[in-house]
Amino acid sequence: MMKIYRTQDKQLTRVDDMSEGAWICLTSPTDEEVRRVAATLDIEPTDIVAATDPEESARISLEDGYTVIIVDIPIKVDGASEGVYTTIPLGILLTQELIVTVCSADTAVVGDFAACRVKGFSTRKKMRFVYQLLYRAATMYQQELRLIDRRRQAIEKNLAGELKDSDLMELHALESTLVYFATSLRANATVLDRLTRYKRLEQYPDDRELLDDVIVEIRQAIEMTLSLIHISEPTRHLRI
């Protein structure tokens, strides 16, 4: 699916043209949508679809005329119990004129911008949009980590009584989620570090405070994840 937005008179508006100041939002895009965006913006189709590959690693690369940024964002595993998540790539492509986001699924990280739930958001402020996406992703990790911790505590209360195989399986799934999160958050932190040092990407002084906030939130999410992994260690022998 492809939707195109542009901030006009401080309002987010759906538009049809891929012109300056627009945000092209691709969710599980069709081949035709990929070809159309690639041809219009002179972008390699492989760079557009990269983020739809669940195995794609977080990275940043400077291409001829555009920049590719890929980060990992959390998403709930379909059909799984509460607190069981995985991560999927979110692609962000920056050209001189506009920004493109690509993801294999609908997520709140992107959806909150389309629903106008993010203050100070403008499609015309590309780097600020990137930082806002990373900030939203970091805070979502923290939100999901709190859910994981609550679910872990609820399960471990049962360990003093009858131990069920389903409880052990769920604890293992929660632990796997924490490992996914730790790996993805570290990769995102590396991308952010590189992002701040690329001179090609225009940075504005007003965005510095937001950038600092993103760095703090990612670090906090990493610390929360590592702390929960450590807390889970005493019950790990029960799942072997």
Spans of features found by a protein language model:
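C-terminal amphipathic alpha-helical segment
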Residues: T225-I229
